[in-house]
UniProtKB/Swiss-Prot annotation:
Belongs to the avian keratin family. GO terms for cellular component: intermediate filament. Sequence repeats lie at residues 70-76, 77-89, 90-102, 103-115, 116-128. The lineage of its organism: Eukaryota, Metazoa, Chordata, Craniata, Vertebrata. Pfam families: Keratin. It comes from the Eukaryota. Keywords: Keratin, Repeat. This is Scale keratin. The avian keratins (F-ker, S-ker, C-ker and B-ker) are a complex mixture of very similar polypeptides. GO terms for molecular function: structural constituent of cytoskeleton. It comes from Gallus gallus.
Length: 155
């Protein structure tokens, strides 16, 4: 690589020697251009793979026939946290009997139309027990009917 000066040449003119040496002229040196090849480093690009999902579903197939002894409406077991069926012989909705059956319904111990307590009580609303209380009769039951047989006490 060769360089050349861009500084002004010294002239052959005689001049007096200065007392202080100072100069205010820039001197620039320019060299020829150089070239180089820069290759980028290899780049690794990762494409995410597909997401495979599965949603297995289980099915239980029953048969028609006699009711089972478990929790369901029309059964003999507990339904909705209870111990009987909606139309059966056990509790429904936190109770111990069926809504139309022989046990408690809705926090009670009998059926709404049956033989036990309904709705916080111990008997049925239209049956042989009591509704909305802790007694043993209801306004429409066989033990308390002020329209037919008198009263067995306030329900």
């Amino acid at each position: 690589m060769s360089c050349y000066d861009l500084c002004p040449p010294t002239s052959c003119i005689s001049r007096p020697q200065p007392i202080a040496d100072s100069g205010n002229e820039p001197c620039v040196r320019q060299c020829p251009d150089s070239t180089t090849v820069i290759q980028p480093p290899p780049v690794v690009v990762t494409f995410p793979g597909p997401i495979l999902s599965s949603f297995p579903q289980d099915s239980v197939v029953g048969s028609s026939g006699a009711p089972i002894f478990g929790g369901s409406s029309l059964g003999y077991g507990g339904s909705s946290l209870g111990y009987g069926g909606l139309y059966g012989y056990g509790g429904s909705s936190l109770g111990y009997g069926g809504l139309y059956g022989y046990g408690g319904s809705s926090l009670g111990y009998g059926g709404l139309y049956g033989y036990g307590g309904s709705s916080l009580g111990y008997g049925g609303l239209y049956g042989y027990g009591r509704s909305y209380g802790s007694g043993y009769c209801s306004p429409y039951s066989y033990r308390y009917n002020r329209y037919r047989r008198g009263s067995c006490g306030p329900c």
